[in-house]
């Protein structure tokens, strides 16, 4: 997958220098999601080995870690008013986009403020989604540890889980995630459209640093 990532980012560099469109962003997003799915499927044999080797004590430790992680999430993202959460999201978005584009101009900041105020999902939704995913994963772990299925059967269950990750959500949950994804991509397209030549060079350089990282990883394999 690493050479494919590098090639895709190289193509995105050229798109940025011309005019990055919403359709191109959708294509890039779909490519990344499909690549993650393929990489996850390739890891299934290793994951099955790991899960079958776990002890009950290790599973209990995993549950405690998840409980602590969830408590940290609640403290960091849910222990504030809706307005404070919006401000927090704005600061996080600003940090991310400054990293990619360089310093944003006044018009881009205005676009971000409008998009942030109208964000289609909140932190509570992502927390609920997080809990659902954790329970699905723990159910697989319990199945492996308690029933000790044969390797092929566990691999099949893991493959079903991975393939269903983006396909088996409820209609309501998937609709919210789709709206959030579209909202994010539209914001990126708008920021790129209003980007200066310097910002485009910054974005190309940022993508090049990732390409270089991928190239190093490929050479080390």
Regions found by a protein language model. Give the residues of each.
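Solvent-exposed, acidic/flexible segments
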Residues: 10, 29-32, 36-44, 55, ...
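A cross-kingdom marker for long, charged
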Residues: 127-221
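Short, flexible domain-boundary/linker segments around small modular repeats
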Residues: 13-33, 96, 154-175
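N-terminal Sec/ER secretory leader and immediately downstream segment
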Residues: 1-57, 61, 65, 206-210, ...
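Extended amphipathic alpha-helical interaction segments
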Residues: 40-170
């Amino acid at each position: 997958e690493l050479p494919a990532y590098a090639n895709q980012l190289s193509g995105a560099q050229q798109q940025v220098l011309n005019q990055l469109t919403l359709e191109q962003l959708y294509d890039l997003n779909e490519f990344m999601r499909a690549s993650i799915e393929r990489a996850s499927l390739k890891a299934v044999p290793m994951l099955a080995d790991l899960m079958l080797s776990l002890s009950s004590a290790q599973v209990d430790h995993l549950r405690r870690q998840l409980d602590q992680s969830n408590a940290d999430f609640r403290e960091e993202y849910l222990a504030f008013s809706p307005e404070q959460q919006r401000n927090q999201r704005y600061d996080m978005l600003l940090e991310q986009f400054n990293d990619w584009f360089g310093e944003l101009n006044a018009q881009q900041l205005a676009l971000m403020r409008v998009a942030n105020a109208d964000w289609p999902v909140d932190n509570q939704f992502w927390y609920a989604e997080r809990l659902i995913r954790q329970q699905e994963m723990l159910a697989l772990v319990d199945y492996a540890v308690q029933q000790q299925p044969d390797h092929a059967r566990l691999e099949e269950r893991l493959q079903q889980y991975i393939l269903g990750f983006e396909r088996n959500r409820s209609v309501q949950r998937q609709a919210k995630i789709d709206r959030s994804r579209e909202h994010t991509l539209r914001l990126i397209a708008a920021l790129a459209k209003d980007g200066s030549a310097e910002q485009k060079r910054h974005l190309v350089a940022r993508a090049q640093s990732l390409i270089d990282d991928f190239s190093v990883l490929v050479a080390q394999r």
